[in-house]
């Protein structure tokens, strides 16, 4: 199982939101590149980057930071947040980003998403955020009528091989993740490599996710608060 420590960017700083709420934001570092180097030193091979400004208003205000992270090297980087056009995908891939994560646009413009999956293959992942089992979009403000599992099946049929699935209720809450959910996803949509995201806060959970065949896990707040030690987690999932 792969681990993706997370860097959420707001105005060039490393922050965490609680349950996607911009008014409940904590700044953890003023220097994202230094933070990435810390992760690398702890044995990380991957990095999950979210452009929160992009997600909110579609701007590219964290472009320089993301370019610097990619240039620094050593880590496979996936980027999400505000990626709604092919131009933006090209922009990030040209920086050396490993893959782009499509979020709300996958729900609002499924045809576009299917085209991008066909054209870029494994350079595209889809981020599915679910609230009470239903797909949520636009910074989790709107909830659609489609169950998350059904949406994942549709994505798989369109050629999607990687989905980052977040249970909103768990995200940034440090109360543990929804293990049953990832078990269901692995069983119902076996062709997709799922990344577990949201609320992972114990080594036992990581081991459980690994055991059920989850492809990857994103670690955010648990690393910043010291609840989990990255070097130890890297060791655990490799054993």
Feature roles, as predicted:
Residues 8, 39, 47, 92, ...:
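Conserved, mostly hydrophobic/aromatic
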Residues 11-12, 19-23, 90, 97-171:
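Conserved anion-binding
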Residues 46-64, 104, 165-175:
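Glycine-rich, proline-tolerant flexible connector loops at the mouths of alpha/beta enzymes
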Residues 48-51, 78, 101-102, 125, ...:
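Conserved beta-strand positions in the central sheet of alpha/beta enzyme cores
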Residues 53, 58-118:
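Glycine/small-residue-rich loop that forms an oxyanion/phosphate-binding "nest" at active or ligand-binding sites
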Residues 60-67, 141-150, 175-184:
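Charged helix-capping and loop-helix junction motifs
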Residues 73, 77-99, 180-216:
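Catalytic cores of alpha/beta
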Residues 83, 94-112, 167-170, 198-202, ...:
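Glycine-rich phosphate-binding active-site loops on the catalytic face of alpha/beta enzymes
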């Amino acid at each position: 199982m792969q681990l993706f420590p997370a860097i959420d960017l707001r105005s060039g700083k490393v922050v965490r939101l609680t349950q996607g709420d911009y008014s409940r934001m904590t700044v953890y570092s003023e220097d994202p590149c230094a933070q990435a180097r810390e992760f690398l030193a702890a044995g990380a091979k991957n990095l999950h980057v979210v452009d929160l400004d992009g997600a909110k208003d579609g701007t590219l205000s964290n472009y320089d930071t993301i370019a610097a992270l990619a240039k620094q090297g050593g880590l496979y980087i996936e980027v999400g947040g505000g990626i709604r056009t092919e131009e933006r995908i090209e922009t990030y891939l040209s920086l050396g980003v490993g893959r782009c994560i499509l979020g709300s646009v996958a729900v609002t413009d499924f045809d576009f998403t299917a085209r991008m999956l066909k054209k870029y293959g494994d350079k595209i992942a889809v981020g599915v955020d679910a609230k009470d089992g239903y797909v949520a979009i636009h910074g989790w403000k709107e909830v659609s009528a489609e169950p998350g599992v059904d949406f994942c099946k549709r994505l798989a049929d369109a050629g999607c091989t990687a989905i980052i699935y977040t249970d909103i209720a768990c995200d940034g809450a440090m109360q543990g993740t929804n293990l049953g959910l990832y078990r269901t996803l692995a069983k119902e949509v076996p062709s997709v490599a799922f990344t577990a995201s949201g609320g992972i806060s114990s080594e036992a959970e990581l081991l459980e996710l690994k055991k059920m065949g989850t492809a990857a896990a994103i670690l955010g707040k648990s690393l910043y608060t010291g609840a989990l030690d990255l070097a130890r987690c890297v060791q655990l999932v490799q054993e």
